[in-house]
C-alpha cells in the first residue's frame, strides 16, 4: 500500500498551484487525500499574498514579518473564494484554528519565539500587533555563508508528513477535527486569477454596499464620490525618499535610540515620526536631552512634537463625514458590534498610506493613554489629554457634536487592535461576487442572499403564525410569573389576554 508521502507526491502539488495546470472541472473532492491539497494550497496562498516586510515587535525591529490578522484575512478569503466547502459559512474562529495548525507544524513561527519558552505551546493571535515569520530550513551550504531558503508549499507538505512525531494521517485528522469537510459536489472549481484592478473595484464597491446596510445615511453623495474614486495601488515606502535626503541620519539616530530602549511608549512614538516632515525630525533629534536615561524628558519632547504636527494637519478620517454620524449614533444606542464593523469598513476605504499612518497614530494614542504609562500632565488623566490633543487629527466634522466626537475617538482608541481587521461578512460578499465574475454570471444577481432569502408565501405565513404564537405565549408566561404584580393587577391582565387570545390562554393554562 502506498504511503501518505507517496500519495502526496503523486498529487504533484507544486504544479497544481498554477491555474494553467488545472484541468477543466477540477474538483478537490475528485482527488484522493483532498485535504492534503487544500493544506498545500493554503500555504501557497499565505506565502504569496500576505504582506511580508520589516516590522516592529516587542520594541525591536524584525525583518520579513507579517501580522496575524492579515494572515487570517488572506486565508479566509482564499477558503471562501475557492469554495472548498461548498456554500457553508466559515466562521473567522475556524480560520484562526487553521493558522494555529500551520504554526504548530512550523509553517511559520511567532516573533520572537523565545518569549513562549521551551515547553509552552505558542498561541496564534488574530491581531494586528502579533507578528509572525515564515520558517526557514538549513541549506546544505549554509555553513559557507549562503542564505537559508523558505520551504515551497510542496516541500512543506513533504516535511509535515515526514516529521517523526506526527502520525501519517495527522493532517487529514486535523482537517476533519476542524469540522470543515471538503464538499462532495463535483461543481467545486478552483477559481481563476482575476486582475488586481477588478479585485480592487469589487472590494471598493462591496465595502460601500455593506456600509450602507449598517449605517443610515441621509445623503449618498459622499459615498457615491468615494465609489467613483479609483482604488489606489500602495505607493513605495516613504523611507526610500528619506534615504536620499540629508536628514536620514537624524531619523536613523532616533530609530537606533528606540531600538536600544525596551519601552513600548518610545517605540510607538518613534514609529509615528516617519510621517513627520524632515525639519521637525531634525528639531527633535537636536533637542534630545544630554542624559540618555532621562526617558521622561524624551517622552515629553516626542509627545509635544507629534501632537503639534497632527493638530495642524488635515484629519486622517476627513472622508465620508456622514458615516461618522452614523457610527456615533450606533455607539450612542449601544450597538457596539455593528459600530465596530462599520468602522472596519470605513477604514477599509482609506488608501494604503493613510491607513498605515492612522494605524500607527492610533496605536501610539492607545499606549500614551494608558494610566500606568508616562504622566503627560500632573493634574489630568492621560486618556483625556490624548483625546483632547488628537481628536481633530482624526475627525473634524462640523455636523458631529463634541460629545459624539469624543465618543467616537475613545471608541477607536479602545478598539485599536480590531478596527483594522476586515469583517468576515465582507469577505463572503466579495468572494461570492468574484466567483460569479469568474464563472461568467451576473455578479449582482446572487449577492442578495447574504442579507435576505426569498421564501414561498406559504412558508412566510407559517413562520409569521408560529412566531406570533410563540411571542404571545412568552408574554402570557411573563405575566403569570411576574412576582411584582399584585393579585388584582395580574387577574386584570390575564382577563384582558383571555379576551383577545382565548386559544393561547387555554393552551397554556388548560380548560
UniProtKB/Swiss-Prot annotation:
Residues 46-136 form the DEP domain. GO terms for biological process: intracellular signal transduction. CDD domains: DEP_DEPDC4 (cd04446), RhoGAP_BRCC3-like (cd04405). Pfam families: DEP. It comes from the Eukaryota. Disulfide bonds: none annotated. Belongs to the DEPDC7 family. This is DEP domain-containing protein 7.
Amino acid at each position: 500500500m502506498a504511503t501518505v508521502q507517496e500519495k502526496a507526491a503523486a498529487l504533484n502539488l507544486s504544479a497544481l498551484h498554477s491555474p494553467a495546470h488545472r484541468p477543466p472541472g477540477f474538483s478537490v473532492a475528485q482527488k484522493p487525500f483532498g485535504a492534503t491539497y487544500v493544506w498545500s494550497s493554503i500555504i501557497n496562498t499565505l506565502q504569496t499574498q500576505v504582506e511580508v516586510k520589516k516590522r516592529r515587535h516587542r520594541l525591536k525591529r524584525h525583518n520579513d514579518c507579517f501580522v496575524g490578522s492579515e494572515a487570517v484575512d488572506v486565508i479566509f478569503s482564499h477558503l471562501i473564494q475557492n469554495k472548498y466547502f461548498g456554500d457553508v459559512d466559515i466562521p473567522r474562529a475556524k480560520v484562526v484554528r487553521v493558522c494555529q495548525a500551520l504554526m504548530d507544524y512550523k509553517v511559520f513561527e511567532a516573533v520572537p519565539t523565545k518569549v513562549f519558552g521551551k515547553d509552552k505551546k505558542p498561541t496564534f493571535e488574530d491581531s494586528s500587533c502579533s507578528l509572525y515569520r515564515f520558517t526557514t530550513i538549513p541549506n546544505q551550504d549554509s555553513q559557507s555563508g549562503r542564505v537559508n531558503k523558505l520551504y515551497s508549499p510542496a516541500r512543506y507538505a513533504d516535511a509535515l508528513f515526514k516529521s517523526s512525531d506526527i502520525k501519517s494521517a495527522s493532517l487529514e485528522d486535523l482537517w476533519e477535527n476542524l469540522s470543515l469537510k471538503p464538499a462532495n459536489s463535483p461543481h467545486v472549481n478552483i477559481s481563476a486569477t482575476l486582475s488586481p484592478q477588478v479585485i480592487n473595484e469589487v472590494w471598493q464597491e462591496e465595502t460601500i454596499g455593506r456600509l450602507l446596510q449598517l449605517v443610515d445615511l441621509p445623503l449618498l453623495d459622499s459615498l457615491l464620490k468615494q465609489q467613483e474614486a479609483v482604488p489606489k495601488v500602495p505607493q513605495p515606502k516613504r523611507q526610500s525618499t528619506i534615504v536620499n535626503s540629508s536628514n536620514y541620519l537624524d531619523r536613523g539616530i532616533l530609530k537606533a535610540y528606540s531600538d536600544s530602549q525596551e519601552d513600548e511608549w518610545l517605540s510607538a512614538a518613534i514609529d509615528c515620526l516617519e510621517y513627520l516632515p524632515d525639519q521637525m525630525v531634525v528639531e527633535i533629534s537636536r533637542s534630545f536631552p544630554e542624559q540618555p536615561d532621562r526617558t521622561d524628558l524624551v517622552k515629553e519632547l516626542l509627545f509635544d512634537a507629534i501632537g503639534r504636527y497632527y493638530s495642524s494637519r488635515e484629519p486622517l478620517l476627513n472622508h465620508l463625514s456622514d458615516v461618522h454620524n452614523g457610527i456615533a449614533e450606533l455607539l450612542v444606542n449601544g450597538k457596539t458590534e455593528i459600530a465596530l464593523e462599520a468602522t472596519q469598513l470605513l477604514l477599509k476605504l482609506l488608501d494604503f498610506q493613510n491607513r498605515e499612518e492612522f494605524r500607527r497614530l492610533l496605536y501610539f494614542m492607545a499606549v500614551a493613554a494608558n494610566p500606568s504609562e508616562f504622566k503627560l500632565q500632573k493634574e489630568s488623566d492621560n486618556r483625556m489629554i490624548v483625546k483632547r490633543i488628537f481628536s481633530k487629527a482624526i475627525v473634524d466634522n462640523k455636523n458631529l457634536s463634541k460629545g459624539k466626537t469624543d465618543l467616537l475617538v475613545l471608541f477607536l482608541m479602545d478598539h485599536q487592535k480590531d478596527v483594522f481587521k476586515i469583517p468576515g461578512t465582507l469577505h463572503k460578499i466579495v468572494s461570492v461576487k468574484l466567483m460569479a465574475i469568474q464563472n461568467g454570471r451576473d455578479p449582482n444577481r446572487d449577492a442578495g442572499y447574504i442579507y435576505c432569502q426569498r421564501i414561498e408565501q406559504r412558508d412566510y405565513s407559517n413562520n409569521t403564525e408560529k412566531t406570533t404564537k410563540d411571542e404571545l405565549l412568552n408574554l402570557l408566561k411573563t405575566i403569570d410569573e411576574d412576582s411584582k404584580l399584585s393579585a388584582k393587577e395580574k387577574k386584570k391582565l390575564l382577563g384582558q389576554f383571555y379576551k383577545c387570545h382565548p386559544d393561547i390562554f387555554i393552551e397554556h393554562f388548560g380548560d
